[in-house]
């Protein structure tokens, strides 16, 4: 037996189980559509419909196949698929859940006819305004310490029923709490808004929000700017944190209790951290409703906030590994559905990362460095190697007893007739 045969068999079983659970509750036509989208996108590492069609082994031309996928994306009802995905995602989350919230953008600088196209700030180009769409995302940290999406929505402020970005964020949090449960929500300083604080308190959720320098807070002696309060806290606790680039030492943190002017009856803790800025005297500060009574609890707040960088890595992977910003569809509904399918494909990688198969995938990827904290690139590389091996194996002529079976020979064909292949 070849050395990769066992991982190939396990991988096809995992993908078959995943596809079966994702298509639960759908009819035959929709099941085939979902299966071909998931497999084609996984193998091609692209959101281009021509590439997805090219990686679905059948007798239909690429042109007709991509046109069919485009039509189905424009009319597909995503609610059931999202529910099935969330059910699987919940299984790989730890008991104490950490949710990371952030927004990104999908830039389409050359697009002209895409529906509800608007101007967004391109974060990779000094915030310049370019045509595109907004992307709201909440990821959870799974048992493998990798980010897995629990909410993803592509939207435009030009849409007919659009209200505000705050509304999208609040709807996202409400949906996550309803489907998964309570957890600790982490936000960057772009979310420093009194409305969000009030909403999270109303929902009885724990949170950590990085504050901006414009924030005013209530202390014992009155209302002060948060920077002035931070300067009075010189860093009571010393600690160090290990990053991918090495050990970060000489870090200091302090905390104090404050209140917000618009929430004078709600006590919050302000944690001030020194050592991350090039200017040693310049700290950053986060506000949280977590209880802090010791050095350990104070440092844990800092560590939880620093997990926020995982969502930045997630956005980077989503755009680079699958060419997400190269999507070419006119309908806003089709674009939203394409985003959901890509999120589902990445969810499958997260599931693989929580199985014993993870070790084989990382070995197959032949990494240059022994260990990284963000594993999706390696998991994807290993999966694609196994998928190509499986495709070559399936292209061999079938045994005589199976010649009456239709010509289409893809992974799902193999899974449906797996017993016949094994007996032959």
Stretches with model-predicted labels:
Residues 66-143, 254-258:
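Active-site-proximal, Lys/Arg-enriched surface segment
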Residues 35, 49-50, 66-67:
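Short amphipathic alpha-helical segments
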Residues 1-46, 95-97, 110-112, 141-424:
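Single, function-defining residue in the core of a domain
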Residues 44-54:
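Short, charged amphipathic recognition helices of the HTH superfamily
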Residues 53-56, 268:
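Polybasic, low-complexity association/targeting segments
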Residues 56-68:
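Short, basic interhelical loop/turn and adjoining N-cap
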